[in-house]
């Protein structure tokens, strides 16, 4: 069934990112774009601060995260494969393929939120990288403005 296969792939994306953060993240953010090129990125909220995947060791926790290029590459490979599989599942069931998925998961509460866009989000002036950076900055502003959680800082 479409929903089951689609959900299982999203769960796999969340699982690999949760594993990457060793379960310490309060929120996991996954950006998955599929507009001719596939781009996957992930960042984390820990103790009301945002951290891009390469900066998790700046969180000041007593755990050492493997932020090596090799480990980051392995995570991105899995995320990219899952994005391709999502496209295949959508095609198999004649469903529209999301051009952009913004997934947010809170491991402690198991709260999951997904925002899907089915129209291209890029243009000659705006790249998928620009859109990822804009989402990161949007979440940063929410933290700093106290809209979602107590004020924090962002580690880029």
Predicted regions and their residues:
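Acidic, proline/glycine-rich low-complexity IDRs
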Residues: 107-156
């Amino acid at each position: 069934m479409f929903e089951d296969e689609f959900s299982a792939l999203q769960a796999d994306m969340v699982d690999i990112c949760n594993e990457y953060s060793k379960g310490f993240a309060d929120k996991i953010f996954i950006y998955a774009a599929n507009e001719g090129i596939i781009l996957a990125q992930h960042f984390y909220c820990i103790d009301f601060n945002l951290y891009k995947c390469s900066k998790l060791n700046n969180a000041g926790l007593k755990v050492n995260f493997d932020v090596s290029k090799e480990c980051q590459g392995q995570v991105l490979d899995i995320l990219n494969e899952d994005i391709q599989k999502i496209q295949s599942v959508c095609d198999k069931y004649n469903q529209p393929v999301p051009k952009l998925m913004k997934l947010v998961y809170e491991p402690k509460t198991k709260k999951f939120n997904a925002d899907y866009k089915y129209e291209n989000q890029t243009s000659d002036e705006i790249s998928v990288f620009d859109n990822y950076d804009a989402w990161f900055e949007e979440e940063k502003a929410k933290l700093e403005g106290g809209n979602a959680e107590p004020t924090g800082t962002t580690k880029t």
